[in-house]
């Protein structure tokens, strides 16, 4: 399951219309009644650099806390996305959408964690999904802290080649724990959460591009400076040997 920009933008636009009629609280209530459970925060803490990389991946911006998803914040973001769609330039449009997402910090990451939780509870591909997802996103955004979100993403996030959790993925990719990673590897790790199409051993250029995007966002978030960003971007990926069950790369 990926951080799906197109699906999320469409959902925000639809929710914005619903929010304009103050339907979001009702939808959230229905979803809460249909949900088997709500996620609980992780008890282990994500290392600082990895957490900043995941925050950048989820478009948290410079915010230090989450912003509640409610009819007013949804309507504001929906208006922003509608304005962004007016641009004829794809790159400019994508950049504007990124800025719109920051109006509700890390809403992509919140939506992703909600989806991971729903699938773990067996609520997937059935009629309850839209209601439960709205309820879960609303609950997480209004009651969790930034730290709780990052800790839970690091613990439960899915990474390429079937790794679950940032520490497991770090040991698989780099041969050491997430706490031991330097900036280049922490940024690469954070950039791959929620990805399924990137094999860093087979697609090093694509992996490096993902890392650069996260490094640029970390710089924009003031988590790192220009010099650190450039040095990390020039660094090798730092991968260890692929796991024994790794399939050969296609030609």
State where each predicted segment sits:
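N-terminal type II signal-anchor transmembrane helix
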Residues: 1-53, 224, 231, 242-243, ...
